[in-house]
Amino acid sequence: MLERLRNLVLETLPEEGRIENPMPCLALTRFNGPQKNRQCFHHPMMALVLGGEKESLIGGRPVVYGAGEAVVVALDLPGAYQIRNASPEHPFLSLSIRLDRAIITELLTEAPELRPAPNGRDAQESVSVERLPDDILNALVRYLEAMHSPRRAAVLGPMILKEIHYLLLEGPQGRVLADVCSEAAPGSRILTAVRWLREHFDEPLDIATISERTAMAPSTFHRQFRAVTSLSPVQYQKRLRLHEAQRLMLVESLGVEAAARRVGYESCSQFSREYKRLFGDAPARDIREKTVGASDAGKCACVMEA
């Protein structure tokens, strides 16, 4: 089934590039050469490598996964990755499914046995690498095959997508996926904090306010947040600001100072230092290099990875 998936991606992407939403929540990626220090922001997703190997830093956790292995991410997390060995003859290939919390919540209502036990345990780390079982691979094959038939895509697509979510909930990472979508569970409280940070990243960080919103003491909130994301709240906010600033410069053509102030920096020099520390180059030079001669896949990947 892995070979069938690989062939389906090659048929859809005969050249280097990235396709978003050929089916709902689906993205396909092909790189024909190495990629270094690509910064991205991960939505909740399952990403399966079909050719090559990917080295990623997701949140604060390093992960390496190759052909036949998948990474499952339960929360919105900043990240970076590189691909060492890829060529036109042996391209890096991957597919990803963006996880839909509405589907997960619906499944937890229909199958309450998948809900986490309300025992007050700590939140779980939100990233895992695993080999997908045959039933998920089979569902992915059927989902990609449905791309080629508008009728099947419309009728069978939603059912197969829901099936993929259900099978993931049954798997090793299902407990964490259920945790972040179950009201009052520790993971759900951290999800509340992540959403607040994403909506208010340009404001001064107020741990007391976030702790109150998550119904946790500040010390408990810090511990749980780091357990789930492998980052402190301050580190998470900084990554949000820098990724959004890069997007503003790359997509909306804002200047360095305007982007820095838009995301909450009062000091442009501090912004430039922290930007270079994360992205490896000064803001203006980094954006210039990304907009001149970059592939479509590279341009997309430096902003968002779903």
Language-model features and meaning:
Residues 1-22, 26-29, 35-36, 120-125, ...:
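A short, N-terminal "cap"/entry segment at the start of jelly-roll beta-barrel domains
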Residues 5, 104-163, 167, 179, ...:
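Amphipathic alpha-helical segments enriched in hydrophobic/aromatic residues interleaved with Lys/Arg
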Residues 18-117:
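N-terminal regulatory/effector-sensing and dimerization cores
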Residues 55, 204, 253-254:
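Residue at a beta-strand N-cap/secondary-structure junction
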Residues 118, 154, 172-176, 189, ...:
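Short, structured loop/turn "capping" segments at alpha-beta junctions
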Residues 163, 167-173, 180-182, 186, ...:
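Basic/polar phosphate-binding segments, predominantly the helix-turn-helix DNA-binding elements
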Residues 192-203, 230, 244-251:
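Short, amphipathic alpha-helix enriched in basic
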Residues 247, 251, 255, 262-306:
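…primarily DNA-binding HTH/wHTH and HhH modules…
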